């Protein structure tokens, strides 16, 4: 089990290359076509092509700088009131202090299932919990679920998942979904294949109380089905249709043995 905690997410460079290629190749080809069809000096034609390449670099950087905002908008979250959700805020503060990371902002979705996720672009992070998690879980269960969120932030998984999913989301659904198989493979390449197990074990190391997370995951399983295809990998308990390597029953069995 120790090995699941040692391996982290892979390099994000292929994600940026994929996005730049998917956006830039059509732009560069269009620029070349314009340079060929419209009579112009060679230098001007080269400038058109260089301009297309520069636009590609700008669009790639702009997308990266806003991936956290893009995903929070996609999830349709609202700020969690610090009075109504004082318990969650207090738990996040304590768990963050224990793990050595800055406490994330807390957001809420109106979904009545039990689930949570972490969003992080580079610095500040965000924790998102469902209304179901806020209302259905007792303190120990919520602590276990939030501990997994903090563990993903501390271990780098939150940033890797945020950037990979946020950058490649345009190619997993909608008019560009013909690129979905390649985009999905790229996301899976970046994310640690043991991420669910390593997250569970890191969360338990934070709380020192495996039943809390176990019971939260059991309730999440009963409420499974949250989220869209594009955000499935972000959740602590991914929808059953996602490409999660480990079935939830395996995760629960390991927690029962812990």
Task: Walk through the language-model features, giving the residues of each.
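Cytosolic juxtamembrane N-terminal segments of multi-pass membrane proteins
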Residues: 1-10, 127, 146, 153
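Residue-level signature of catalytic and energy-coupling elements of molecular machines
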Residues: 68, 92, 129, 148, ...
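Short, Lys/Arg-rich cytosolic juxtamembrane segment immediately N-terminal
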Residues: 6-14, 156-161, 229
């Amino acid at each position: 089990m120790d090995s699941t905690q040692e391996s982290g997410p892979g390099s994000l460079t292929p994600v940026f290359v994929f996005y730049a290629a998917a956006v830039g190749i059509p732009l560069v080809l269009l620029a070349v076509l314009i340079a060929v069809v419209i009579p112009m000096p060679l230098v001007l034609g080269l400038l058109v092509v260089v301009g297309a390449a520069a636009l590609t670099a700008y669009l790639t950087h702009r997308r990266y700088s806003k991936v956290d905002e893009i995903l929070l908008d996609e999830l349709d979250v609202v700020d969690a009131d610090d009075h109504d959700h004082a318990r969650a805020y207090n738990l996040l503060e304590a768990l963050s202090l224990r793990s050595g990371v800055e406490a994330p902002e807390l957001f809420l979705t109106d979904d009545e299932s039990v689930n949570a996720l972490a969003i992080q672009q580079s610095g500040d992070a965000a924790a998102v919990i469902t209304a179901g998690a806020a209302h259905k879980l007792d303190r120990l269960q919520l602590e276990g679920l939030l501990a997994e969120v903090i563990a993903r932030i501390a271990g780098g998984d939150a940033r890797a998942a945020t950037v990979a999913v946020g950058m490649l989301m345009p190619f997993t659904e909608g008019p560009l979904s013909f690129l979905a198989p390649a985009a999905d493979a790229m996301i899976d390449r970046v994310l640690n294949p043991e991420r669910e197990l390593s997250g569970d074990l890191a969360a338990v190391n934070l709380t020192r109380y495996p039943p809390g997370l176990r019971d939260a995951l059991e309730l999440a399983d009963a409420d499974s089905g949250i989220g869209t295809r594009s955000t499935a990998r972000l959740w602590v308990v991914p929808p059953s249709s996602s490409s999660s390597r480990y079935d939830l029953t395996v995760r629960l069995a390991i927690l029962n043995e812990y």
